[in-house]
Amino acid sequence: VEKIAGMDVEPMDMNNIPGCTYASPEISSVGYTEQAAKDAGFEIKVGKFPFSASGKASAAGHKDGFVKVIFDAKYGEWLGCHMIGANVTEMIAEAVVARKLETTGHEILKAIHPHPTMSEAVMEAVADAYDEVIHM
């Protein structure tokens, strides 16, 4: 519609559209899988954080699931994010925005994440990818 109206339209990045499955547990993802990133020629860093290590998840009784992140090892580009667990369809937005803005893993680690929250599992997974995780 914007194009028909004569507006400048930014090309859509089809690899940055979040996928959300509303089931129990919920599933969400954006970007490359590990295999797709390797197939595309990337050398990757992968981090994973289980909700069983999250204080908020434990308190809420939602300890099943995890957050997994995939980064380009050379430049730190956030290539993909995959989550399984309670409320993860709400949490994928951080990865979508970070990918859109070409945020690196180190920038995510420097951003203050609220604690205790389920969403801080994203930061913890990033920390794991960079061998800086402390809460696991």
At which residue positions do the language-model features occur?
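Flexible, glycine-rich terminal cap/loop adjacent to redox cofactors
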Residues: K3-G6, I17, A23-M136
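Glycine-rich active-site loop/strand segments that organize a redox cofactor
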Residues: M7-D13
